């Protein structure tokens, strides 16, 4: 492609809290993009008659924070890649938990989110949400996801346009299969990676107790629904 986009939102590998960067080797796109973020003024600071633009210029403070991180990024990425490889090798020995395998054509990964694939058949049909809650109780930073069309800003737009999205396979994945671990977890040491794996193993080995908790939670939820009615 002609344009690359990188976010610097607080959860990213490099962060300044918010903002991002756009990269391009296309001179025409470069001139228009600068005008878009600089109140319509291009690289030569002259007004672009086609583009009004906004004030999206990055502050010097944010740039300084990012420059410091840029120097550390190569060594941090190397550490993450090494720890992710270790974690994958441990998961390969466990039934019921898989991960997104990297395409062999990819020569280098940013390691932003590590995605787990949960198979409840190996965990006595415990729901994904209960499994995730158990892992968090063991100190593992996992989270479930949601579909973007369920977010308030998208829901309002879809309602206005009378669009009813229907993505059943995606719904199943986010509700029953997919868990993510943030990238900064893999900046730890070898012991940290083994601790994460051991936490998953502990939850699996105590599945009967977790099953009882899951049933109790469902009963409680039904009772609360009856009371609210």
Language-model features: locations:
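Extended hydrophobic/aromatic segments used for targeting, binding, or gating
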Residues: 107, 112, 121, 128-130, ...
């Amino acid at each position: 492609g002609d344009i690359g986009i990188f976010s610097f939102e607080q959860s990213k590998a490099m962060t300044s809290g918010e903002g991002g960067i756009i990269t391009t080797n296309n001179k025409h796109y470069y001139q228009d993009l600068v005008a878009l973020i600089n109140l319509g003024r291009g690289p030569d600071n002259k007004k672009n008659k086609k583009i009004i633009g906004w004030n999206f210029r990055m502050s010097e403070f944010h740039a300084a924070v990012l420059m410091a991180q840029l120097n550390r990024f190569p060594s941090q990425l190397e550490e993450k890649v090494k720890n992710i490889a270790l974690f994958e090798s441990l998961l390969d020995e466990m039934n019921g938990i898989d991960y997104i395998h990297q395409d062999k054509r990819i020569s280098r990964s940013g390691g932003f989110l590590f995605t787990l694939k949960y198979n409840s058949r190996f965990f006595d049909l415990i729901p994904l949400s209960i499994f995730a809650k158990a892992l968090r109780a063991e100190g593992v930073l996992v989270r479930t996801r949601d579909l973007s069309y369920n977010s308030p800003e998208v829901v309002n737009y879809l309602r206005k346009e009378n669009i009813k999205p229907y993505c059943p396979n995606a719904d199943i994945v986010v509700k029953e299969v997919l868990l993510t671990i943030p990238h900064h977890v893999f900046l730890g040491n070898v012991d940290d990676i083994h601790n994460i794996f051991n936490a998953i193993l502990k939850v699996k080995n105590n599945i009967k107790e977790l099953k009882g908790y899951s049933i109790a939670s469902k009963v409680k939820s039904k009772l609360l629904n009856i009371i609210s009615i």
